[in-house]
Amino acid sequence: MEKLMKYASFFYTAVGIRPYTNGEESKMNKLIFHIVFWSNVINLSFVGLFESIYVYSAFMDNKFLEAVTALSYIGFVTVGMSKMFFIRWKKTAITELINELKEIYPNGLIREERYNLPMYLGTCSRISLIYSLLYSVLIWTFNLFCVMEYWVYDKWLNIRVVGKQLPYLMYIPWKWQDNWSYYPLLFSQNFAGYTSAAGQISTDVLLCAVATQLVMHFDFLSNSMERHELSGDWKKDSRFLVDIVRYHERILRLSDAVNDIFGIPLLLNFMVSSFVICFVGFQMTVGVPPDIVVKLFLFLVSSMSQVYLICHYGQLVADASYGFSVATYNQKWYKADVRYKRALVIIIARSQKVTFLKATIFLDITRSTMTDLLQISYKFFALLRTMYTQ
């Protein structure tokens, strides 16, 4: 099971978080994680605070475009910070969830083959690795874009004067461009960008690992039901049904636990992402220079890839849970006792109530959620365009 969790554990360690306990920790390890976490949080809070001050001052000076740009950065900070704190808050619940998943995790070659574990493990690992690398490359390219511009245009090609710039707009009450303070500010902003990105990647990849296991258990349940050969003996067949129902109920409880842990951060993620996509798209359509368009495009891709990843796994869970009702109907139930057939009707009725990944009670997450999000973003985009032209 650690193979499924390795990418999430790596990025959580980078921001000083242990999402679940795995035995006793030494005092030194706890201290190190504590220092790393609060160093990340304090720096990220500092950058977010001064970005907020910049937004206020930009609105006061009628610098609408700059204010919108800074708002998209604040949204990025908000999502990262919220995911980090919610995971720390839900550490006990996550530990209980992971322990229960370990209890039903298929160990041994025979069980691994029955559950088709290598396929699920390989798919989850590939998606997690590609997503982590994509998001990391996009964010670090965004963070270092201003430095690359300075060295390429100003120092190497000498075709235009760029000057020293910072990756994110924030209020700084002194002249920092030709001052030694530029370098600490550059480090602070890059550190904050890395913190927010790592906080988001780790939580997204953890959700993928947990959702993959839910899908695996739903699929195993469906295969077991569909391929089971009935004996026609009510006592023997009813024992099989009892085991299936208990297994199904356990998976449903695990699904509820996942929604309880991730529901609020997912809701906040979708709300903020709709604004971020809107803000970034707006900036790309108001005549900014081509190099800035490239920078904004990277930011847009990172936000949309995150939303699609969550929606994709939400769809997989929904399809797998509904597939159990189809598998139950496809069983050779016509050979069974009439009492067995009546029991199957109840099981089918229950399994047709689809299990979703939920952003609290407000949103069932599937691929169609991506469409809804883009529609909301476009509405805000149209509103911003109207305000800007007026």
Curated annotation (Swiss-Prot):
Q: What residues are glycosylation sites in this protein?
A: 179
- The primary site where this protein sits is membrane
Q: How does it sit in the membrane?
A: Multi-pass membrane protein
Q: Which residues lie on this side of the membrane: Extracellular?
A: 52-66, 148-200, 282-291, 382-390
GO MF terms listed in the record are: ionotropic olfactory receptor activity; odorant binding; olfactory receptor activity
Q: What is this protein's tissue specificity according to the annotation? A: Expressed in olfactory sensory neurons in the antenna.
One GO-annotated biological process of the protein: signal transduction
Cytoplasmic-side stretches of the chain, per the record, are 1-30, 88-126, 222-260, 313-360
Q: What else is known?
A: The atypical heteromeric and topological design of the odorant receptors appears to be an insect-specific solution for odor recognition, making the OR/Orco complex an attractive target for the development of highly selective insect repellents to disrupt olfactory-mediated host-seeking behaviors of insect disease vectors. Odor-evoked OR currents are independent of known G-protein-coupled second messenger pathways.
Q: What is this protein called?
A: Odorant receptor 85b
